[in-house]
Amino acid sequence: MAAITFHLDVVSAEKKLFSGRAESVQVSGSEGELGIHAGHTPLLTAITPGMVRIIKQHGEEEIIYLSGGMLEVQPSTVTVLTDTAIRGEDLDAAKAAEAKRQAEEQIRNQHGDIDFAQAASDLAKAIAQLRVIELTKKSR
């Protein structure tokens, strides 16, 4: 028996990264992890830097890094809007690790001209990218 699906769009400021049928989607919401399946109650919520894990129509998994954004759930359509979205296999582990190191350094060595909130945001994004890279490697 075929799984019940819904239409999913993952759209960044630059391009549409995914548009198709999905069995489920998992994102990091502002209130915690969200799992969306067909028939989910309509919802509009902020999403935090992290990933969107898509289970496509025939069970294939795709993981995409998101810099944060919005998630909208309608009866037959789910839309993820984000400033930055990068497929897990396209992320650069060395670059993400360096960004994490730099953000940690900025937080440790705070001076008047360093914006703590920006450094914390950069750290969260780098950690999220490293997590997506790790999960992408495991799913191959």
UniProtKB/Swiss-Prot annotation:
It comes from Photobacterium profundum (strain SS9). F-type ATPases have 2 components, CF(1) - the catalytic core - and CF(0) - the membrane proton channel. CF(1) has five subunits: alpha(3), beta(3), gamma(1), delta(1), epsilon(1). CF(0) has three main subunits: a, b and c. Pfam families: ATP-synt_DE (PF00401), ATP-synt_DE_N (PF02823). The lineage of its organism: Bacteria, Pseudomonadati, Pseudomonadota, Gammaproteobacteria, Vibrionales. Coiled coil: none annotated. One of its GO terms (cellular component) is plasma membrane. NCBIfam families: ATP_synt_epsi, PRK00571.1-4. Belongs to the ATPase epsilon chain family. It is found in: Cell inner membrane. This is ATP synthase epsilon chain 1. InterPro entries: ATP_F1_dsu/esu_C_sf (IPR036794), ATP_synth_F1_dsu/esu (IPR001469), ATP_synth_F1_dsu/esu_N (IPR020546), ATP_synth_F1_esu_C (IPR020547), ATPsynth_dsu/esu_N (IPR036771). It is a peripheral membrane protein.
